[in-house]
Amino acid sequence: MTPERDSLAAVLARRDWENPAVTQFNRLTAHPPFCSWRKADDAQRNQYAAQIRSLNGVWKFAWFSSPQAVPENWRLEDLTEAGTINVPSNWQMYGYDSPIYSNITYPFPVNPPCVPAENPTGCYSLTFCMDDDWLTEGQTRIIFDGVNSAFHLWCNGRWVGYGQDSRLPSEFDLSEYLQVGENRLAVLVLRWSDGSYLEDQDMWRMSGIFRDVSLLHKPTTQITDFHLHTHLNDDFTQAVLEAEVRLAGGVNDDLQLVLHLWQGETLAGEARATPGSEIIDERGGYDDRATLRLNINRPALWSAETPNLYRAVIQLRTADGELIEAEACDVGFRQVRIDKGLLLLNGKPLLIRGTNRHEHHPERGQVMDYDTMVQDILLMKQNNFNAVRCSHYPNHPQWYALCDRYGLYVVDEANIETHGMTPMNRLSDDPDWLPAMSQRVTRMVQRDRNHPSIIIWSLGNESGHGANHDALYRWLKAEDPSRPVQYEGGGADTAATDIICPMYARVDQDQPFPAVPKWSIKKWLSLPGEQRPLILCEYAHAMGNSFGGFAKYWQAFRQYPRLQGGFVWDWVDQSLIKYDADGKPWSAYGGDFGDTPNDRQFCMNGLVFADRTPHPALYEAKHVQQFFQFRLLPGEERRIEVQSEYLFRHSDNEILRWMLAQEGNQLASGEVVLDIAPQGRQIILLPAFPQPETAGQLWLTVRVEQPLATSWSEAGHISAWQQWPLEEKLCVSKPTRASVAPVLTMRDGEFCVTQGNLRWQFCRQQGWLTQFWRDDEAQLLTPLIDQFTRAPLDNDIGVSEATRIDPNAWVERWKAAGHYCAEPALLLCDADELADAVLITTAHAWQYQGATLFISRKTYRIDDHGEMQIDIGVEVASGMPYPARIGLSCQLAQVNERVEWLGLGPHENYPDRLSSACFDRWNLPLDAMYTPYVFPTENGLRCGTRQLRYGAHQWSGDFQFNISRYSQRQLMETSHRHLLQAEAGVWLNIDGYHMGVGGDDSWSPSVSPEFQLSARHYHYQIAWK
C-alpha cells in the first residue's frame, strides 16, 4: 500500500466488514500451531520455544461508537484519552458498552451483509521492542488466536491486513513492517461485521481481542504446514504414520526432512525424505512438499479411555544435517469409521457420553485460561463424560491438546450459525456466502486435523440446509476421509451428514414439525432406507432445575446399538458477574446489562454453575452414564454381576466395596478387587449376611472405587455405584408402656389438644392446625395448610413471558385454572376424644372463581405418646391441569442448622431425576438443602423419605420434602438469587406427591406422563412428633 492508502480513512472507506466475499486481506494460510523449535530435544519434550513471544498483557485502549468516530492520528500514536485493557479480554467486561445475550434474534436489524452504522469499535495499541536477531533473517509473524468480530491491523502506521471469523486465528507476516527498537501495533476491532450474520449462536455477544496474541519467528526456509495421517491394519496390530509436509522459502534438493516418532523417551521410529512429492498429474509433482512414512509394530492405541500419545517431531535440516527448525505435535493411533450403521473407534462401537460446551467464564467472559480448561476436562472425566461438542465454534487451540492428553472425544464445529434468519437457510443456500462459509470450515480443518481427539467434523449449527452445506460436506469428505461429518440443520438426516444428529428428539414421542419433523429416536432408526447411526447433537436441556427423564434416554441407548448416545445441553451456566453498590458480586443473565434484545435466563443451561460448582443434574449424569453396570442375580446366594462398558480399558484400578445397611445403619461390608476385561463381566459372590435383630428395610449398596490416583482423579474416586432394597425384616413390635391420654379442650373458635408438654391448636373457623407448642414454646409461624403449587421451574415457564404468553406452558395453565389464587373453603372441622387419642377431622374445598379445584380431607390422630398422625386424602377436579404437587406446608419457628433424614440423598432429587440419589441416613447443614439456581425456582426436594428430623421435630412416613429459608411465594416473585431474603424460621414442604421436572427440552411441556399427577384421587400419611 502507498502511505495514503495506509490511512484509516482509506481502509474504512472499503467497508470490508460488509462484504461477504472479503474475509481477509494478507492473512496467512491456516496450519497447525507452530513453535519453530531450534532444538529437536525441545520439540520432543514440548518445552519452551524461544521463537514464540507472547504479546498478552496490558494494551492501550479507546472505545468509539463507530469506526468513523476514530481519529486518523490513532493509527500513528496513542490517544490522550486512551485507557488500558488486558489482552486477552472482552471489552464489555471492562464496562465498554454492554454484553448482549440473545438465543436466536440478531442483536441488530437483519439486512445482510449490512450492519448498523453505530458499530462499537475498540482501538487497541501496543508498543514493544524488537532486537535485530529476529529482523536480520527469517520471518516474523503475528498471531491473533481470536478477535470478535473483525479487525484491521497496522504496524508502525502501515496497514498490514484484515481478518474476520472470531473463533479461528488470523496470522500475518510482519517482517517488512518491523524495525529494530520500538514498534507500535494498532488494532481496530469492530463489534459487528457481515461475519456476525454467521455467528448467531446462543450465547453472550461480546467483542474484543479475547484470545492470545503472539509473535512467531520462522527461518526463511521453513515448514509451512504438516498433516499427520495414522493408518491401522484390520486387527490394529500394525500402524503407519504418514506425514505430509509443506515447505517455503528457498526450497531445494539439498534439504532434508526427518521424522522422529517418540513414545515417551523411546524413539519408536524414524523416516527421512527430501523435498518433492510423488507425481500428481501430467505436469509432475510438487517440489515444495514431501511425504514421510514410518511403520509401527503393535502401536499403543489412542482412545478416550486409554489416551496413549506419541510425539512426532518433524525436522528440517540442511544437507550437512544442521537443524533449521523443528515442528512437533502429539500423535494418537486410532481409526474412526462408520460400518453397518455403527460409529466405530478402533473397531468398537462407541457410546457417546457427551456434553456441549461453550467457552465461558463468569468474570472473564469468553476468555479461556489453561486452568479453567483443565478444570472442565477433569470434571467431565470424573463424572463419566467421554465426549464434548465444541458448541458452536472452534475452541481455543490448547483445548484440543488437553482433550488429546486426558482423553475426550471431540466434535469440532465450524463457526457457522444463522438461526435468526428467515428462512434459516437464507445464507447457506446463497452462493454469495459460500466463500465466507468455506473459510470457516476449511481453516478449522487445517488448524485442527492432527488431533486424535477430534473424531467428527461438524459443518456448524442451526443454519438450515443449503447448497453451501452440500459443497462443504463434499470438500470435507475429499480432504479428510478419515472422519465422519455431522450436521443437524435441515432435519438432522440430510445428505450433508454421516450421522443422524437431531437435537431434542424424544425417546418415544414424535414431534411432527412442518418441513423438519423430529421423530422419536427409536422411530428414526427404522425409517425406510435409513442405516446411519443416531447420536443426539443436543438433548436433556439442563436449564435450572431440570434434567428429568435422562435415564430414559440411556435405557434406549443401551437397548438399541445404533442409538449411540448424545451431547447434553449443556456444560456450564453462562451467567456473568456484576457488582452491586457495595461491591458485592452477583450473577447476571440476559437483560441485566440493559441489553436488548435478550432472552433472559435462557443462557443458564449448565450441568455446572458458571463457577464450575455442580448442579444436582451433574450427579444424575454421572450415575446414569457410569461405565459399570450391576445386576443382583436371583437365587439364595447373594451374587452380583458387574459388567464393564469400557471398550479398551481393563479394570486395573478398581475395587468394588459393598455394604449392607438397615435403615441407614451398617450391618456388614466388604471389598473385592475387580478384574474385568473390556466389555467383560465378573460375578461376585457375597458372604452370608447377618440377621438383623430389629425390623426395617435392608439395602445392599455397591461402589466401584479407584484406589490409585489417575491423571484426572484423586485416589479413592468413586466411578460407579448401585443399590438394591432387600427383604424387610419383620418383627413383632414390643408393647409400649401406656402413657397419659391426650386431653381435648373445646374453646370458642378453637380445638386444643394437650399431651404432656405438647399442645396443639386447631382453628375451628378455618380448619387448620394453627399452632403447636413444645414446653410452652410456639413451634409454628404459619398454619399447616395444603399446597398444590411450586415456584415455577424454567421448564414450567417454557417460552412464556409477560409480552408473549404461551398458553401451553405449565405455569400458564396453572394460572388460568387458578392454582396460584385458589382459596380454601371449610367444609368440615370436627373433633372426637377416644380412649387413648384425639381425632380432629377436617375437609376443605380449594376454589377459584366459584369452581372447586381440590377437595382435601384430613384426619389428625394425636395419641398418648404425643405423636400426631395425619391422614390426607385429596380429590382433584376433572378437567383441571395436573397439579405440581400434593402436599402440606408450614413455617417453623425455630431455626436449626442441621437437617437429618432417612431417604434419598444427599443431593436434591425429583421423581424423574433420582437415579443418582442413594437411600441412607443423611445429615446436612440447613443451607445445603437449598440449591442456589441463579433464577430462583422450586428446589431442594428429597424423595423417598422415611424419616425426617429437624431440631426437636420428627416426621415419618413415605414422603418428599424440602426445607428452606425461602417461601415458595418469594422464590416465585424473585428474579435473581442474590435478591432472596432469608425469612423468619424455616419453610417446610412435605409432599405426598410431586410432579417431575422434565427436561427433554425447556420450551415445551416435557414431563413424561408417568411423572405427571394425572390421577383424580390421592392419599398419603405423615406422622409428626
From Swiss-Prot:
UniProt EC number: 3.2.1.23
Gene Ontology biological process terms in this record: lactose catabolic process
Site (Transition state stabilizer): 358, 392
GO terms for cellular component: beta-galactosidase complex
Domain of life where this protein originates: Bacteria
SUPFAM superfamilies assigned: (Trans)glycosidases, beta-Galactosidase/glucuronidase domain, Galactose mutarotase-like, Galactose-binding domain-like
Keywords annotated in UniProt: Glycosidase, Hydrolase, Magnesium, Metal-binding, Sodium
Cystine pairs: none
Segments passing through the bilayer: none
Magnesium listed as a keyword: yes
Pfam family membership, one: Glyco_hydro_2
Oligomeric form and interacting partners: Homotetramer.
Stated name of the protein: Beta-galactosidase
Lineage: Bacteria, Pseudomonadati, Pseudomonadota, Gammaproteobacteria, Enterobacterales
